[in-house]
From Swiss-Prot:
Self-association and partners: Homodimer.
Biological-process GO terms, alphabetical: 'de novo' L-methionine biosynthetic process; diaminopimelate biosynthetic process; isoleucine biosynthetic process; lysine biosynthetic process via diaminopimelate; threonine biosynthetic process
An annotated Gene Ontology molecular function: NAD binding
Binding site for substrate: Q159, R237
Native species: Rickettsia typhi (strain ATCC VR-144 / Wilmington)
E.C. numbers: 1.2.1.11
UniProt binding sites for phosphate: R101, K216
Purpose: Catalyzes the NADPH-dependent formation of L-aspartate-semialdehyde (L-ASA) by the reductive dephosphorylation of L-aspartyl-4-phosphate.
Gene name per UniProt: asd
Pathway as given in its UniProt record: Amino-acid biosynthesis; L-lysine biosynthesis via DAP pathway; (S)-tetrahydrodipicolinate from L-aspartate: step 2/4; Amino-acid biosynthesis; L-methionine biosynthesis via de novo pathway; L-homoserine from L-aspartate: step 2/3; Amino-acid biosynthesis; L-threonine biosynthesis; L-threonine from L-aspartate: step 2/5
Family: Belongs to the aspartate-semialdehyde dehydrogenase family.
Protein name: Aspartate-semialdehyde dehydrogenase
Length: 338
């Protein structure tokens, strides 16, 4: 008989929390009891889990003593306060915030790339889910690096407002609507107007001119894939509700051509490749909403530098970029460690 587990989803009313519940139901995760948890502000609300309706539990009074796995999807401040309480009750935590990603005692996992490091989870009973851009990047870059070592990567990201939570989506919607009725709607969540606009500003600016988002992406790539290649990142917020896109320029240590890259990625887990066989042979963010794969298109040789390839990555940032990746981690846990 299949063992079943008690699961808690913290931040269940948020974008990633709701998607986590959806994916747990879709993939028939073996669940005994499941708890939807949020702040007191969400008490009285309900969320869906497959065909079931779950009532929100208060995080401030929740007891983790009988929870096997908790998915934390509610922001770094919540993780900082409540994850120690969960792990003290021997609950395994999969944290989707940035809080533990730099901790050397906490594995940072993309299942298609570095599952071997998952065994280190029991040092703190915490597993970190990577940044929503890092996950699709690693899914695409790791199989290439396994074949021919990467020397340098230049990354430009185009990140949807859902990466900033429901408040980000609301601001894009409200500003767009306001423009059509000639009503002023000043930025609240974002530093500048997001409707009909974009800006290279995600996170705070560091003294070196890079943003915290750009620094996180570079660091997490090196933690997962190693420090043998250099990375340069520019992160851009775009007026799209769901779906991230990434323009990537990859310099390799040896000779490689676009056809080689396409063949390698066609055999890789979690990737759908699109051949350059017509003028619409690329995937845009709106086309990946609700999809689990990482889509790679516009694979081509860099005409300015040898051994270098350009490609375009798109991914649903709420699914593979966040919720799906964490559920895949949990599946590996129950299959091999619990």
């Amino acid at each position: 008989m299949t063992k079943k587990y008690n699961i808690a989803v913290i931040g269940a009313t948020g974008n990633v929390g709701r998607e986590t519940l959806n994916i747990l139901a879709e993939r028939h995760f073996p669940i005994n009891k499941i708890y939807a948890i949020a702040s007191n502000n969400s008490l009285g609300r309900e969320v869906r889990f497959g065909a079931k309706i779950l009532h929100i539990n208060s995080l401030t009074i929740f007891n983790f003593y009988d929870i096997d796995i908790a998915f934390f999807c509610a922001g770094s401040n919540v993780s900082k306060e409540f994850i120690p309480k969960a792990t003290a009750d021997n609950c395994i935590v999969i944290d989707k915030t940035s809080l533990f990603r730099t901790d050397n005692q906490v594995p940072l996992i993309v299942p298609e790339a570095n599952l071997s490091t998952l065994k280190e989870f029991n040092t703190k009973n915490i597993i970190a889910n990577p940044n929503c851009i890092v996950i699709p990047l690693v899914v695409a870059l790791k199989p290439l690096d396994n074949e021919i070592k990467i020397k340098r990567v230049v990354i430009s990201t185009y990140q949807s407002v859902s990466g900033a939570g429901k408040a980000g989506m609301d601001e894009l919607y409200d500003q767009t609507k306001s423009k059509y009725v000639f009503r002023e709607n000043n930025p609240q969540k974002f530093p500048k107007q997001i409707a009909f606009n974009l800006f290279p500003h995600i996170g705070d600016f560091n003294k070196d001119g890079y943003t915290t988002e750009e620094t996180k992406i570079a660091f997490e790539l090196s933690k997962i894939m190693g420090t043998h290649f250099k990375t340069s990142v520019t992160s851009v917020r775009v007026p799209v509700f769901i779906g991230h896109a990434i323009s990537v320029n990859i310099e390799f240590s040896n000779k490689i051509y676009a056809k080689d890259v396409e063949e390698i990625l066609q055999d890789a887990d979690g990737i759908v490749t699109i051949s350059n066989n017509n003028d619409l042979a690329y995937i845009s963010p709106i086309e990946v909403v609700g999809k689990d794969a990482v889509y790679v298109s516009r694979i081509r040789n860099d005409l300015s530098k040898e051994n270098t390839i350009n490609l375009w990555i798109t991914c649903d940032n709420l699914r593979k970029g966040a919720a799906l990746n964490s559920v895949q981690i949990a599946e590996e846990l129950i299959n091999n460690y619990l």
